[in-house]
Curated annotation (Swiss-Prot):
Knockout mutant characteristics: Mortal germline (Mrt) phenotype in which there is a progressive decline in fertility with each generation at 25 degrees Celsius, and after 2 to 3 generations the brood size is 25% that of wild-type counterparts. Fertility in these mutants may be restored when transferred to a 20 degrees Celsius environment. Progressive decline in fertility is probably due to defects in gametogenesis causing a failure to produce mature oocytes or sperm. Defective RNAi inheritance. Abolishes RNAi-mediated recruitment of nrde-2 to germline pre-messenger RNAs.
GO biological process: germ cell development; regulatory ncRNA-mediated post-transcriptional gene silencing
Domain Piwi: 650-977
Lineage top rank: taxon: Eukaryota
Originating species: Caenorhabditis elegans
Protein name, as recorded: Argonaute protein hrde-1
Any one GO molecular-function label of the UniProt entry: miRNA binding
Chain positions covered by the region annotation Disordered: 1-51, 298-375
Region: Required to recruit the small-RNA amplification machinery to gene targets and promote gene silencing, residue numbers: 1-551
Compositional bias ranges of the Basic and acidic residues kind: 18-33, 315-335, 343-364
């Protein structure tokens, strides 16, 4: 009998494991935790193109964090309903809560909104119970937004049902959440249900793309219904148990929390099967702390030696535009009227009776139990009084956070900025029973709330809603718990905690997933799943057979090197295959970190290292330029780089005390805006290169980067002949011509900004950050890389400006190799199946540029989506040992069929060597294959390309062009922040507005933002060094 995976994939397998029907029948009535997981064998490629070009070197048995789900008992049809929740305000206005008008941003509001919608639907069910055939609420699968699903036949109501809900329809503890949708206690809610068609679970129509995607969504919603309570924080498919203690606490204002992600997918061949992937997650959260303690901590970070990249030690350069700058204002509100109702009530849910994390405050938040000392507040007052970078850095840290007003029973506000003025020098006109008079903010709080401010000289916190600004004393605010720390706001301490000791080993990882299935998802004896006919077949992970791919062959100048299979890191003393040839080197010593005599000696040493590696430097080291500069003098740095570029200096070597100081990003910014190559070394690195102890490895690492930055190539990647005495392929020369000759590789990566980029007309400035696109492309030889970055406005998945930048890549190849590529392989960082159509649109835009490149030009495109953040994990079937290298799968492990993307070939590949924690493999989906290469060929080609990384001499997790594109996107993000610091963006925006006055209206905000972003992109990247791996 055919193996289960063969049935799912619709292909045969040469290594079938028989399905044991008798055992399955015996286990039928056993709980899922007692049943064995089905054993899967890996079938061959579903692409019917050619035979396998590469032989199987070795295999290993693996397990994945995927679990089989039986859906054959689901009703034939699931009825879909459109749900409209309309807020009926006491002032007569009606607003549809699902249209985004009320959709406040932020994690706290997302949590509150989800619970409010859930309680509303539960109450609607109770009121319309007869029209739901008297069925329990378990027959409702609600996405807590605009869509409801029911098994066919359950609903017996009309084509439209309306229910009006008021405060009297909810228990007090539920109304507390429901009222937060409108933030007014006397509003009512009109809920409108409209049948909106069916979703099919069986037959051919069930396999149509739109139906298949929605059926997958139903399975996701049904299996997540038990998470709709206040015990869990949900963000997309990530869930974090609220009551669990934090995993760790990196500092006084942050904590690392453990959670999980769950993703469901249908099997490709139907058959009533689906798969659920469950993975662990960790995420940093802000602690429940006072705003003064938070700000004091950020002040300490700023003073603590610069903070390094990612911290707040460096000025983030954002303007504080939009803050209140006057001495008085008649229209400002100091009462926090936009906050929510407070209280310490309890409310019911699936478990009934737990306390809401956002409304129950600890004693430490009271005036008698402050979590900061008077000296902390005094130091903060002094720092703000000195101006400088304090306000800008703390404002950037606070901006966008939800904070609670302790004087308003925990009402929430969102921080927009920090005002220039404080509670003593900010006044407004107040009306009361004594008439109208001018009062300061400090006086107002004493009169209105009987609160005498202890620190009235701290700046006021501004919260903006629409065009109205409210001001709040800092000492009356607390950071609301349950908010994740965004990547761009993580301090170095938090970043270290996320990547170091918190990484779980595979053995522990597998156990954690089992705990999640049992304790959190509770998929056994689940009434929601029973109502929809969904059954978890086993809580044991599926077993598969993976291939171990051979490493690439590495060619240096004098020898060809074959890395060890599964342990591919390699070292060699051979010379670079293409050493750079340069004219002159310039040395800059920052902040007197080394003596001038030592700098001169370093020039001699560096000259020797260049000669040893075959790098030609025309000018003698005694003729190199050496300068001493202050690292904070950006003007002097800029002028020197311009002068040296005119003097034909090829590369600037900057020496600083720290490994990644502020000046590092300044150098990289001017590198792309001026066009002079740079490399930054720390004092310790220079000492190692000058001395003997431990210096060899340091010298090798530096020279590998140095050669690339100067235009050389360290080694070439080739298709191997044999590994471990076994032939890899029948003819590697034939495959070389097929897969590498006249083939260009291009990688695309997007780094999104903090929010969607639009033009905010009310403040006359950009709102949010642009996205940064990193692009890397290969030249004549596939390991010779060039690249660039550019900005685009919208925080969306689709690449923009391809008509300009795709031809740029191809023309660079032609200029270098004197011919156009006949095949172009594109590696595109991607998300899930739902985004494939947008990538296809990108492909069509690329095709439309062919004639622009050259009339009649028609190369074959191969487009591969790389999902680095895929939740799929691969472990050895038998995990043993204590080290990460023992417990993880080795480099080159490849699972050919991963069952999740309907109609596309895909594979999971782990290229990197795991050194810590659990390896995260990358999932690849072959979206376009004009060249008709087999999946066997593309699997091996992808692994070979990972060896192209020219610095570490071992493969990273993705192919070299994609790894380079990722680094370029990061570089572009840093450059944007530096650009904000040194360029008056307000002046740029005003000039663009003047030139595009026709765009100044609400409907054209995106077009105006695009014009501003294009201007910045040209200014930042106009002198990018072409056809060179300058970012190494």
């Amino acid at each position: 009998m055919a193996d289960l995976l063969d049935k799912i994939m619709g292909s045969s397998s040469s290594n079938r494991i028989p399905k044991r029907d008798n055992r399955m029948n015996q286990d039928k009535d056993e709980p899922t935790s007692k049943r064995s997981a089905p054993m899967f064998s890996t079938p061959k490629s579903t692409t019917p193109i050619g035979r396998d070009s590469f032989a199987t070197m070795d295999t290993m048995n693996v397990q994945m964090n995927m679990f089989p789900v039986d859906i054959k008992d689901m009703p034939h049809k699931i009825q879909r309903f459109q749900v409209d929740v309309i807020v009926c305000s006491s002032n007569g206005k009606q607003i549809n809560a699902n249209l985004g008008v009320l959709a406040a941003k932020g994690d706290v509001n997302s949590h509150n909104r989800r619970l409010a919608q859930y309680y509303i639907m539960r109450t609607v069910h109770d009121k319309l119970l007869v029209k739901f055939s008297g069925k329990s609420h378990h027959f409702l699968a609600y996405d807590c937004a605009a869509t409801l699903y029911l098994p066919e036949g359950v609903y017996t109501g009309d084509d439209q049902e309306e229910v009006t809900l008021t405060i009297d329809d909810f228990p007090k503890e539920e109304w507390k959440f429901v009222s937060k949708l409108s933030r007014r206690k006397d509003d009512s809610y009109l809920v409108v249900l409209k049948p909106a068609g069916f979703v099919y679970t069986q037959g051919e129509v069930a396999q149509e793309e739109a139906n298949r995607m929605e059926l997958t969504r139903i399975i996701e919603i049904v299996t997540s219904q038990k998470l709709n309570n206040e015990d869990y924080l949900q963000f997309g498919n990530a869930t974090f148990p609220r009551l669990s203690p934090p995993h760790s606490e990196p500092d006084a204002i942050s904590e690392i929390r453990s959670g999980f992600a769950k993703v469901s997918r249908l099997s490709q061949n139907g058959g009533g099967k689906a798969f659920m992937t469950v993975d662990t997650k960790i995420s940093p959260f802000y602690k429940d702390t006072s705003v003064i303690k938070f700000s004091s901590n950020k002040l300490s970070e700023m003073k603590g030696g610069g903070g390094g990249r990612g911290g707040y030690g460096r000025s983030d350069s954002r303007d504080s535009r939009g803050g209140y700058r006057g001495g008085r204002s008649d229209s400002r509100d100091f009462r926090g009227v936009y906050g929510n109702r407070g209280g310490n009530d309890r409310y019911r849910d699936e478990s009934r009776g737990r306390r809401d994390m956002y409304d129950s405050r600890r004693d430490s938040g009271s005036s008698n139990g402050a979590d900061y000392s008077p000296s902390d507040a005094a130091e903060l007052e002094h720092a703000f009084g000195e101006r400088g970078n304090t306000k800008r850095c703390i404002e950037e840290a606070l901006k966008g956070l939800d904070v609670e007003c302790t004087h308003l029973k925990g009402n929430l506000i969102r921080v927009s900025s920090i005002a220039e003025n404080n509670a003593e020098n900010t006044s407004f006109m107040m009306k009361d029973d004594k008439g109208e008079r001018e009062v300061t903010v400090a006086e107002y709080f004493l009169l209105q709330y009987n609160i005498k401010l202890k620190y009235p000289r701290l700046p006021l916190v501004v919260s903006k809603r629409f065009k109205h600004e409210s001001f709040f004393p800092m000492e009356l605010l607390r950071i609301a718990p349950g908010q994740r720390i965004k990547v761009n706001k993580m301090s170095p301490t938090v970043q270290s905690a996320m990547t170091g000791r918190n990484a779980s080993m595979p053995q522990h990882h597998v156990k954690l997933v089992q705990d999640i299935l049992r304790d959190n998802l509770k998929l056994e004896q689940n009434k929601y799943m029973d109502a929809f006919g969904i059954k978890l077949m086993s809580t044991e992970p599926i077993q598969m057979t993976a291939k171990l791919l051979p490493p690439a062959q590495i060619k240096f100048k004098g020898q060809t090197y074959m890395p060890d299979m599964s342990r591919p890191a390699f070292r060699t003393q051979d010379k670079f295959v293409e050493p750079a040839r340069i004219r002159k080197i310039g040395i800059v010593v920052f902040d007197n970190c080394i003596q001038m005599r030592q700098a001169e000696d370093f020039c001699d040493k560096l000259s020797n290292f260049c000669r040893d590696n075959g790098i030609t430097v025309e000018k003698d080291s005694r003729d190199w330029s050496i300068r001493e500069l202050n690292s904070s003098d950006s003007v002097a740095i800029q002028n020197l780089m311009k002068k040296w570029l005119d003097d034909r200096v090829d590369i600037l070597v900057g020496i600083a005390r720290e490994k990644k100081p502020d000046v590092h990003d300044i150098l990289k910014y001017f590198e792309e805006s001026i066009g002079l190559q740079t490399i930054q070394l720390c004092q310790q690195t220079v000492d190692k290169m000058m001395g003997g102890q431990g210096g060899r490895q340091t010298i090798d690492n530096v020279m590998r980067k140095f050669n690339l930055k100067c235009g050389g190539t360290n080694f070439f990647v080739e298709i191997p002949n044999a590994v471990r005495g076994k032939a890899v392929c029948s003819n590697n020369e034939t495959l070389r011509k097929k897969l590498l000759e006249h083939v260009q590789f291009i990688g695309f990566e997007i780094s999104h900004g903090a929010s969607r980029t639009l033009f905010d007309r009310s403040r006359s400035q950009m709102d949010g950050e642009p996205s940064v696109v990193g692009v890397s492309y290969s030249l004549t030889n596939s390991t010779q890389l060039g690249g660039f970055t550019y900005l685009q406005t919208q925080k969306e998945y689709k690449l923009q400006k391809l008509d300009e930048f795709f031809p740029k890549c191809v023309r660079s190849y032609k200029e270098h190799s004197k011919t156009l590529p006949t095949r172009i392989v594109i590696y595109r960082v991607g998300a899930g199946e739902g985004n494939f159509n947008r990538v296809k649109e990108e492909v069509e835009e690329m095709r439309r540029t062919f004639d622009k490149i050259q009339p009649g030009y028609r190369p074959h495109l191969v487009v591969i989506i790389a999902q680095r953040a895929s939740h799929a994990r691969v472990f050895p079937s038998c995990i043993s040992g204590n080290r990460a290298t023992d417990q993880n799968i080795p480099s080159g492990t490849c699972v050919e069929n991963v069952l999740t993307s309907y109609g596309y070939d895909e594979f999971i590949l782990s290229s990197q060597t795991p050194l810590i924690g659990t390896v995260r493999p990358c999932k690849y989906t072959i979206l376009v294959n004009d060249a008709k290469w087999s999946k066997n060929e593309l699997m091996h080609l992808t692994y070979f390309r990972a060896f192209g990384h020219q610095v570490s001499y071992q493969p990273p997790s993705v192919p070299d062009v994609l790894y380079a594109a990722e680094n370029l996107a990061k570089r572009g993000r840093n450059n944007y922040k530096i650009h904000q610091r040194y360029v008056n963006l307000q002046a740029v925006e005003n000039r663009i507005i003047k030139d595009h006055s026709e765009l100044i209206n609400e409907d054209m905000r995106e077009e105006l933002a695009a014009a501003i972003v294009d201007e910045m992109s040209v200014a930042m990247n106009g002198m990018t060094i072409p056809k060179r791996n300058f970012w190494a």
